[in-house]
């Protein structure tokens, strides 16, 4: 039987731009190939029926790396913790291939942990198994929370033993396939700007617009398309950060080389979900100054856009980009309020019917109470989903009556929430439970849960807790 992955039509979209953007590389060979995760939910997007794709097909394509060539290690630079670093590039992965989904969109298969490249900088090019497990879990959790994100297509344990300073060593190794819209980063353009490659900047930008920004690719002139692209990118990034903040997600390392040009979450290795609403929460243990703390994500992503503005200034008028950036905070705040309101059961379609000041007041009071009380951030929204009753509209004292509301002015919050519910027409009030269910998963992905899953794997090679958690994260239960 032929391998469905090897029969896909791979497009040389990025490869066709020329070898200025990548280096051809080979995959490492591994002593073992154990499939630990396969994401059957992604297969229909590729026109594949999960029942027709065997585990061995995943291993052959994404563990043994048979059948597809060339593999491309992409070149890029980046600002890391605010300092420019020209010594970057794909150091432990490559672009495996690009395929069209059934919806006509182009998707990347990118590896992580597939061996050394010219950009490994002395590293072994490998991925720890724990790192792979963590990314699988985060991607599925973010997707269920409605956050635009890359996903993991497969995770193969390789049998290698790795030494890491931040993990008990030796530790197990893996190779992962990341499924995303693109692996072109802000840092891809920054590298071209650093080398004064104006023609290549224009070439890559036109490729990005045609491939990932069809809504602006039909503009009457290159200038108008380029300006429109940057405006849409600013909007995408602002909304993405709003999604992170509403989800309680801290990326961890928002260097410009970890920012996708499509406005999609990826490369969030040291991520963390906030246990409580704490703007000073830091996900990465090495973020000593708190540059990438939870509450600083909106500001640092705007800073990253400003760095990209410099790199694109040879192609896009700087004034036009500055004007686009002036809308960043407004877009972010408006979308963030909408998302928090949704987590409170109020859908965006109802927003036009509500008093906007009351809506903002509810969101503000909610966040203030969560910060003061230090109630578990995911548990608060889960309790709303589990306990909501239409009777709350008529009696504020009934709102979360079975939950101890301590440590903050919850009585004021109850009063405001009741006022909002009173504004809803009957059909909208009836829809609140559905909105709450869609917006608020019952299973969190806080660090203790991840560590429990990992300990079962590390100590007993027991993958059942991991599989159970993936299923819960995907379903929202």
Swiss-Prot record:
Coiled coil: none annotated. The keyword Nucleotide-binding applies. NCBIfam families: PRK00029.1. The keyword Zinc-finger does not apply. Mg(2+) binds at residues 258, 267. Belongs to the SELO family. Nucleotidyltransferase involved in the post-translational modification of proteins. It can catalyze the addition of adenosine monophosphate (AMP) or uridine monophosphate (UMP) to a protein, resulting in modifications known as AMPylation and UMPylation. One of its GO terms (molecular function) is ATP binding. Its EC number is 2.7.7.-, 2.7.7.108. It comes from Synechocystis sp. (strain ATCC 27184 / PCC 6803 / Kazusa). Keywords: ATP-binding, Magnesium, Manganese, Metal-binding, Nucleotide-binding, Nucleotidyltransferase, Transferase. The lineage of its organism: Bacteria, Bacillati, Cyanobacteriota, Cyanophyceae, Synechococcales. This is Protein nucleotidyltransferase YdiU. The active site is at 257 (proton acceptor).
